[in-house]
């Protein structure tokens, strides 16, 4: 039995200089698991609650000492002595202990830190890499990365309303080659932006945030960077967008302030369809407000056969909401963010539900990250096929890519890279 003998929660900093929760779990054998949780900038209203202290005199109210205290007292007492290899039972214990629908009492940042640290300790005890512990012998598919190379919206201080412009290398034979492709495009884009006299400073997720005049100018510049790096847009590399439309939806309209547009749901669906016709866009995330299910239905009917429509704020990694979306034919993919739900067991349940329904699952970081690379292991352990973990700069993003390189090396000849087949539900 891999009995838990000690649990230590602590306050650490994330990549934006804000406090977050880290947890160590020590087992009877002496092995330890350590995990740190991320936090988001643009968040869905139905996400599990990230518990913050609210003391304005300390870290501007963003301290997490209450969540840490919950780990070191109540949670510690509840799971001390439990078998770390019984992940589902342990996570259920955390859920029941919290007793709320949204982890609002203990904090999802507390429950997730413990859930992840326990899994890491159990994997170490079993002598298995974390991805293998999660997925068993069937874990062998590397993910196609969504690489956020231009930031707008809530992630940047510029005139772009769309939050993320991403490249997805799909024409390569391995993750290693896909990563090289993305890095070369990143450097080509930096040179193009610099030559235009624009800023090459990077945003929260490592992408550039230049002041392009329009979304189309941004997309055309990215196409130029792909070609400058020696790759073919539409063949070797596809594009992806994260609209984060909930951020610019007001009074029943989509306000693209950077372009002087106020659009109805139907008009915004047409706007996105026009972009998908003009550019090799294979994926659009949060293309409608999280509560605009009628708009989502229009968008899905218009683009759902040829573009991956990812629900992030829409589904918030929650099986109850995802189930409703599947039944109503809303979107065709879910973004998986572990801190939106607060335990690994619930995260895996959302991935499994999506796959059973023919939806894709994209494993994702948050804008406030740490050096923790667990999501890389989740992506391979669940054979998700896609990962979204930022640009080709900032060590908090690169930590995940480097972990994926190690995993691919560990898998050796059995590692597979899906390329375009990652979008298995598109025609």
Curated annotation (Swiss-Prot):
Q: What are the boundaries of the signal sequence?
A: none
This entry carries the following GO cellular component terms, namely: cell surface; extracellular region; phosphopyruvate hydratase complex
Q: What is its EC number?
A: 4.2.1.11
User: In which pathway does this enzyme or protein participate?
Assistant: Carbohydrate degradation; glycolysis; pyruvate from D-glyceraldehyde 3-phosphate: step 4/5
The top EC class, named as a word, is: lyase
Where do the annotations place (2R)-2-phosphoglycerate binding?
Answer: 163, 337, 366-367, 388
Q: Which family does it belong to?
A: Belongs to the enolase family.
The role this protein plays is:
Catalyzes the reversible conversion of 2-phosphoglycerate (2-PG) into phosphoenolpyruvate (PEP). It is essential for the degradation of carbohydrates via glycolysis.
What is the protein name given in its UniProt record?
Answer: Enolase
| Source organism of the structure | Ralstonia nicotianae (strain ATCC BAA-1114 / GMI1000) (Ralstonia solanacearum)
